[in-house]
Amino acid sequence: MRIIPRTMCTQHPDYANVPQWVVNDFIKGDDEVYEAYMNYSIYDCQETMWDFEGKDVDIYVVRKLLENYGGFFINKVLGEDIYLTYRLPNPNVEASDRKIFAEALETIPMAYDLARVFYGKPVKAIFEVIFPLTSSSRDLIMTLRYYERIVAGKCSVELDDGLKVSDVIGEVEPKTIEVIPLVEDMESLVRIDSIIEGYVKVAKPQYLRVFIARSDPAMNYGLIPAVLLAKIALSRVYAIGNSLGLSIYPIIGVGPTPFRGNFNPRNVNNTLKEYPGVYTFTVQSAFRYDYPVDNAKDAINLINNSKPTEPVILSSDEEELALTIIRQYTDRYQAEVEGLANAVNYIAQLLPPRRTRRLHIGLFGYGRGFRGVTLPRAIAFVGALYSIGIPPEILGLSTLLKLNERQWGVLEGNYVNLWSDLSDAAQYICMECIEQLPSMKSELRVSKETIAMVLEDIKAIDELGVKVSSPGFEQRKHALLTKLFLESVNNSYINDAKAYLLDMAKVRRAIG
């Protein structure tokens, strides 16, 4: 049985502090190849996600890793000891990236050939791909069959009398791949078991890794719905695995802020407790670059050396109560986001880019449409709201005042770190800044009606008994920077505004 990684380093553009080895203000090109090497050699991450989804990426990554850092990789076999896993674009969603979907799959045999020469034995350097925005088993079957029948299967195609493709390019290995569904929207998360079952019946894998999104559901539905949806999905994943007699190894996509998972070197133990049954945690860029290297390494090693805990399988009654909370919360949350969208979109374009991202079309959270509103990616969304004194974690919170005793039991029983996450986020509330928003320039103006809803959520923090520490130096500094940012925008000092946004991100140790 292969090793199931505990840690997966990713290329999320969420870091505030640029690493010293980066040539420009953002990581691109050969820097990302070096970064992958660093993930393994310095941070001891067991897996790196190589991201073709919505960003430029080097298709020669395996060649460059083996050629440039052979002394390391000769002792750490890529595909056996450590892993490089592609995240593909979804061709059903991103029409302009359909050929990139095909191109990425075509590089897998190339990686095999390079690794075979380097190691002197057959090595599947890359054999797993992540399929984003998975909404049906057909997505996974299509990806698997495309690889098997088009990428590997073309060898038998006859080009001329007696001349086959294999005579030109050689045999193609591996003959098959493993497809990891990345499930991101509510409808798909609550029927993740049927997606898995449909795929397993066709593909008949020996085991399955399943990727549960955490950040985008938070942006689409709110903090608390995102956590509950993850718990429902994990429960259903294990239930269907038990039913099918199949080992399933979940991945959770957690980021550094409470809204996106609160997974950072200072909060690792809490996150491990929050997600029992999860095998692999995403170690995003801010985790590595916005904390001292030794702190990040120690945290990653702690995860690597920990063992997955027993999963929690919800009863049908618990699941229905959780879904009721999710629906009620989402209605309130989305109404508030609609009113904040104008300000969020304006600020998002001022935040520093940290990767060579392209426009990404898909859910509410990917250039996303919602009630006629378009929003940026989740990282920029979170960063924008923090930067006007409204931590996104608080949006929709007043809904909790209406929960009954049974609903509270399900919420507190399944969101283990609810109170500490809210406490962490609430320290970044800036009341003076929020009250200023209705009188701001049009780019940042927020209606009085929306602000009234936000203030109700803030009031609910006290009514719910959330223990919020007195603001420390960092939080007071953040509030001051928020005021300076608003003043800069109001007076059209845009370069100053950008500088204050970056300074705030450094205080938070993440853009978003």
From Swiss-Prot:
Q: Which Pfam families match?
A: PEPcase_2
Which SUPFAM superfamilies does the record match to this protein? Phosphoenolpyruvate/pyruvate domain
Q: What is its EC number?
A: 4.1.1.31
Q: Does the keyword rRNA-binding apply?
A: no
This protein's cofactor list reads: Mg(2+)
Q: Name one GO molecular function term.
A: magnesium ion binding
Reaction(s) the record says it catalyses: oxaloacetate + phosphate = phosphoenolpyruvate + hydrogencarbonate
Record-level GO BP terms: carbon fixation; oxaloacetate metabolic process; tricarboxylic acid cycle
Task: Give a yes or no for keyword Lyase in this entry.
Answer: yes
Q: Keywords in UniProt for this one?
A: Carbon dioxide fixation, Lyase, Magnesium
- Please give the function described in this protein's UniProt entry: Catalyzes the irreversible beta-carboxylation of phosphoenolpyruvate (PEP) to form oxaloacetate (OAA), a four-carbon dicarboxylic acid source for the tricarboxylic acid cycle.
State the family named in the UniProt similarity comment for this chain. Belongs to the PEPCase type 2 family.
Binding partners and assembly: Homotetramer.
What NCBIfam families would the database entry show?
A: PEPCase_arch (TIGR02751)
Q: Which HAMAP family does this chain map to?
A: PEPcase_type2 (MF_01904)
Q: In its UniProt entry, what is this protein called?
A: Phosphoenolpyruvate carboxylase
Q: Which species?
A: Caldivirga maquilingensis (strain ATCC 700844 / DSM 13496 / JCM 10307 / IC-167)
